Amino acid sequence: MAQFVFESDLHSLLQLDAPIPNAPVARWQRKAKEATGPAPSPMRAANRSHSAGRTPGRTPGKSSSKVQTTPSKPGGDRFIPQRSASQMEVASFLLSKENQPEDRGTPTKKEHQKAWSLNLNGFDVEEAKILRLSGKPQNAPEGYQNRLKVLYSQKATPGSSRKTCRYIPSLPDRILDAPEIRNDYYLNLVDWSSGNVLAVALDNSVYLWNAGSGDILQLLQMEQPGDYISSVAWIKEGNYLAVGTSNAEVQLWDVQQQKRLRNMTSHSARVSSLSWNSYILSSGSRSGHIHHHDVRVAEHHVATLSGHSQEVCGLRWAPDGRHLASGGNDNIVNVWPSGPGESGWAPLQTFTQHQGAVKAVAWCPWQSNILATGGGTSDRHIRIWNVCSGACLSAVDVHSQVCSILWSPHYKELISGHGFAQNQLVIWKYPTMAKVAELKGHTARVLGLTMSPDGATVASAAADETLRLWRCFEMDPALRREREKASVAKSSLIHQGIR
């Protein structure tokens, strides 16, 4: 019996087509097990180490193609982007919108939409920049390099490109004497009429200078010694001049007839600021009150605004007549409505960011909800406000007292008059508030600014008893001709409508 077992074992050992027991696993079998099965055990690794010096080259009958296995994680096709980051709905809407007819709309509808956009957003959406200035960005991490840096050109602007800057004379066009002008920051002593007549208050007198003919006329002189003129303001269209005095009076003069029409008394202290809104004359007093006067009726005092605790030194109606801005010695700026609300006369907005007296207040002529204000020596800032939202759009430290601010109707710029130490006028670009030019010449602080009716010349009155005329907003001749043609066409349409 043992003989048969021995023969069977011998036969199995000599048989070549049977698997060899305890032999190393073939390479193709080991690769297949590693791809589909668990990691090999230490025992199998030890068994393979005996035959590490000899590797079979090719297994008979086995194809050379590698066995394809299913990956454990889906890798994704690199030529197909992930749609989770794509705005497919927006793209579909834009593609479908291109096939629809364009909605041109009526001019009236477009004007209403633009007005709503200006009041709600503070800017026109159609003309706005995609990226708007919102503050200083955070610094990048140390060692960070922007991979998009190669997309931006480092070359200088070609010399053939058109220059965007214009020539601004650094010297005044004319210098007039202003003897005995009161060196008082809180007074408003100069104003330029639509008829091209400049009114200047010199102590107790008011003088008129006709810019066209050069004639000078003394309109009035205070009767009582010690009294003086504290403010002057022309009506928007006409020959009527309002005069505020130190004895709390508001006088109304017909300049053409050189006659005082009426004397309005309602204040208890000097009237340091005046502003017109059609037939309503608003006056600000040292008592902190603002009075509305209806110059058509005998009972002229129609309203009292109480929003300041000290002197109202800045007062200005908006060009559209919807808002009144007031600045006071209490460092407060109030924005008032044109009419009383449900709770009476209350300010729509109150700004308290200034740290000094606010005399300089000016409304943007092309954007009725934008207001510029300037603070005194303790503040030295110019701030731009959106009176609808109450937001401060920008604040610029000018390093000196701000006495007055004017907007240019021809350029998107504004000019400010300053005090110590340089007593200069500065032109700023809006809305970036970049400095365009500085006009120097006064030897004492600027007391007030006013602009000619054509918007080209600015008159500055200073404590050095001079009145300087600066032609800093001269309009381009081609642009002037275009505007003249547009005004003529508009007037002809009005006449046709009247007929």
Curated annotation (Swiss-Prot):
GO terms for molecular function: anaphase-promoting complex binding; histone deacetylase binding; ubiquitin-like ligase-substrate adaptor activity; ubiquitin-protein transferase activator activity. There is a cross-link at residues 485, 490 (Glycyl lysine isopeptide (Lys-Gly) (interchain with G-Cter in ubiquitin)). The modification N6-acetyllysine is found at residue 66. Residues 27-82 are annotated as: Disordered. Its main location: cytoplasm. Acetylated. Deacetylated at Lys-66 by SIRT2; deacetylation enhances the interaction of CDC20 with CDC27, leading to activation of anaphase promoting complex/cyclosome (APC/C). The modification Phosphothreonine is found at residues 70, 106, 157. WD repeats lie at residues 182-221, 224-263, 266-303, 307-346, 353-395, 397-438, 441-480. It is found in: Cytoplasm, Cytoskeleton, Microtubule organizing center, Centrosome; Chromosome, Centromere, Kinetochore; Cytoplasm, Cytoskeleton, Spindle pole. Keywords: Acetylation, Cell cycle, Cell division, Centromere, Chromosome, Cytoplasm, Cytoskeleton, Differentiation, Isopeptide bond, Kinetochore, Mitosis, Neurogenesis, Phosphoprotein, Repeat, Ubl conjugation, Ubl conjugation pathway, WD repeat. InterPro entries: Cdc20/Fizzy (IPR033010), WD40/YVTN_repeat-like_dom_sf (IPR015943), WD40_CDC20-Fz (IPR056150), WD40_repeat_dom_sf (IPR036322), WD40_rpt (IPR001680). GO terms for biological process: anaphase-promoting complex-dependent catabolic process; cell differentiation; cell division; metaphase/anaphase transition of cell cycle; metaphase/anaphase transition of meiosis I; mitotic sister chromatid cohesion; mitotic spindle assembly; mitotic spindle assembly checkpoint signaling. GO terms for cellular component: anaphase-promoting complex; centrosome; cytosol; kinetochore; mitotic checkpoint complex; nucleoplasm; perinuclear region of cytoplasm; spindle pole. The keyword Cell cycle applies. This is Cell division cycle protein 20 homolog.
